[in-house]
Amino acid sequence: MEAVVKTNPYANQENGRMGVANVTFGEVFKARSMNIIKGKNDELFVSMPSYATRKVDENERPVFQDYCHPVTKEFREQLYGAILESFKTGQDVKIDTGTGKDTPDIEVTVVPIEGDNSTKALARICIDQGFVVNNISIKENKDGELFVSMPSIKTTLTDEQGNPEYRDVCYPTTKEFREQLNEKIIENYHLAKDIAMDVADDKAERTGKEAEKSADKEQKGKTSIRGKIKEGKEKAAVNVQQNLADKAKATQER
């Protein structure tokens, strides 16, 4: 499948931020906001868009996670090389993911979220086994309908009410592919929910059986103790009767 890389230089290239890049996969899915940074010795490198997680490192600083990124060394070198080439030449650069198809192959992973909030799950997709998009949300509206929300970042723009505007970092570029992708993500959500429920049922069943076995064992222990007590009482009664018989016999002999 063909992917096209485009870059634009920043008008104000401060703090080493030189430009921004985006890549479109098969003309149906775009990932953008990839920064081109000037590092030491004026060397350029690519920084993927990221967000601060709730985790912190050993210095209590927030840990960042990429919204999207290559997952194989081969595709990372291919993509980053194309971005830097496009930035230096000012031209679009095409790369081939090697699938031989016109549209991307999409693998979906969904993790359901327990609770009563509107976000029901988080999902990630992998494009052609080489590029991952994280932090896709599956949400429920007030009518109980599920919908997919692609990862987005806050911009410097505001709406009419003065609230910050957000824009998607990664998103389908055609209506047809958006519908196909959203349907696939929601299908995988239902599948993940079913699997989670099956696991919970199996766990509950195992817990119930273990509790039943424990109760049976405890009951057998009590029965055993009662049996031993009863056996001891019976032996004591026999001994008493034997002693009385012996005393009676001794009296008769005298």
Enumerate the language-model features and the residues they cover.
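Gram-negative host-targeted secretion-system effectors, predominantly Type III and Type IV
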Residues: M1, E85-T109, N117, S137, ...
